[in-house]
Amino acid sequence: MNLKSDIGARAAWKGFSSQTVYIAYRLMILEDKFDIYPENVEDLMIKKDNKVEELIQVKNISTDLTLSHLKPKDKDSFFRRVLDYKSENLKIKVISFGNIGFELEQVNKRNEEGIKSFKKKMLSYDYTDEEINWIIEHIEIKKENEASLKEKIFEKLNKNFKTSIADNIIFNCLINYISNLSRKVEMTNNKIWNNKVNEIIKDIVSIKGMHEQYGRTILNLSDYRTDKSVEVLSEEYRNGIDAKPDHIRNNLDI
């Protein structure tokens, strides 16, 4: 891999990692009536009663976030895509895991001069006044921190006794779960995730129980010893005796 492609791969992974943590956080705080769709129309789409409520783009770049990072000139840009849902009166969000540039910050604060500059650029990219006004009215640009979001996820996990007993394992399962949803373009919600948590907890309890019993009621076959010869054991098995550890250890049950 050359230097340029290596840098690109690392940047892509950094972005995917931050996006996954953000989606995991949103899943943890969403009410039951909401469904989330990672990597669907946008990095994240949130629906309520099958109606789109939020379209979210997640950015993690090394420089201040600017309008150009959202590629407004492109026919398939973030802004063009969200305008397809204009009639649904949804929220559009840009989540930045880095500083927000001055121009976008001014739009976010609804500063008059900032909005004027934003409008001028968007008009030059062939957006209409109506479209630009709708974007300004519905957009929210928010700075997030990956470490802080992870802390908030752990806080949620530790408030629930069921998930607090193995918070690290549950967290890793959550991140893996969201990653797989993103790759497969599937949806989830609180009910589905809580069912998965119950399965994970059962597995953990089962493994823990086996670990505690190993060496007590559960013994390695090699630990079973007998004074009987292989010939005697073989004769027993041929005569119909139930297979015991000594028969199994000597491969007589095959």
Regions found by a protein language model. Name each.
Residues 5-8, 12-13, 17-80:
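Catalytic centers of nucleases
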